[in-house]
Amino acid sequence: VLNPDLNALIFQFFLTMMALMGSWKLIKTGFVISIMFWSLAMVLGVLQALIGLTAAQALGLHQHLGLLMGTLSMMGGTETLTNFIPAVEHLDKFSGAAQAAMGVATLGMVCSMMVSAPMGEYLIKKYSLKNPSRSEFDNARLIRSIERSDKPFYQTHTIECIKIIAICFVCMAFSHLIKQKFLADVLIPDYTVCMVCALVARNFADTTGWFSVDGLALRTLTKIFLILFILVSTCALQLDLIFDLSAPIVAVFFLELVVNVLFARFVYFNLLGRDFRGMLIAVGGLAFSMGMAANGLSNMQSLCEKYGPNTDGFLVVCVVGLILLAISNTLLIKFLLTIF
């Protein structure tokens, strides 16, 4: 059995490195689209809750079970479920909610792996989308940079990678301290605080020049840690939970799945630009609205491997999905549990 702490540590490293890409210039470029994406994702979160509650009532299920099958397991994912399931079970005095909700979240993760990237391929072919950032890490430019350097490339690249890992350790240590001292009672994931610390560190470095963050080394490490996380999290999936789900719960899930796909295809894509970046954000948004943000990033990565990198699309999904939505979704769930 894989240690869940190892999975969480790898994911924290990956997200901290993604946040280190967040230079002020890149943040300014994606600010408006990030706010739009955040607003639309919140609308989808409310829609998921209403669908779960309505369907649960129609099928004779407990209304809080409907909420668990909606926003908590879909947009919230396993991290949010871990925080809120004990409260729901205590509130309603019923057991089995945790197993059902985790089963729905697991089924969502599996389905998101199957539908997100194919939807992206469909949009690319239908609208002949081109990636404007394809030359962002141009090989010819990299070769010229290597030729001009007076040190062997492997030596320079290794040193830069070690520097980035050290910066990540410092950011994670600071985030742990902040979480313990000031945010102990706040139900937000640890990685959210890590990402905020990394964003501050990157822009502090750009402003003061005290240290640098090498883009190529950062890209190399993010790819390595994303692959590691996908491998570990896939091996850790408890697929047996899916087979324990009752027919009404599966019916509610597939209703949620259809709504999520339609929302990503027609709302995210059409309102966020109808371009390559908009397609990437729609793919990431669909995947993280079905159980786990990392699924969205892995589906985006599979498309970027084929069509070229797009850093601002990745950064928008990371900042919105893992920082802004982690906070606003917690508040939304608390509000929904209060009124229903």
Named regions from a protein language model:
Residues 39-50, 71-80, 199, 219-234, ...:
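Small-residue-rich segments of transmembrane alpha-helices in multi-pass membrane proteins
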Residues 109-117, 121-207:
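Membrane-embedded hairpin module used as a gating/binding unit in multi-pass transport
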Residues 55, 59-100, 107, 119, ...:
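Alpha-helical membrane segments and immediately flanking helix-loop junctions
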Residues 1-8, 96-104, 180-191, 213-219, ...:
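Interfacial loop-to-helix junctions that mark the boundaries of transmembrane helices
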Residues 167-268:
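Transmembrane helical segments that form the transport core of multi-pass membrane transport proteins
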Residues 14-20, 47-52, 108-120, 164-177, ...:
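Hydrophobic core segments of alpha-helical transmembrane domains in multi-pass membrane transport
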Residues 54-61, 105-148, 263-276, 321-340:
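Juxtamembrane and boundary regions of transmembrane helices in multi-pass small-molecule transporters
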Residues 4-13, 22-54, 165, 220, ...:
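Entry/N-cap segments of selected transmembrane alpha helices
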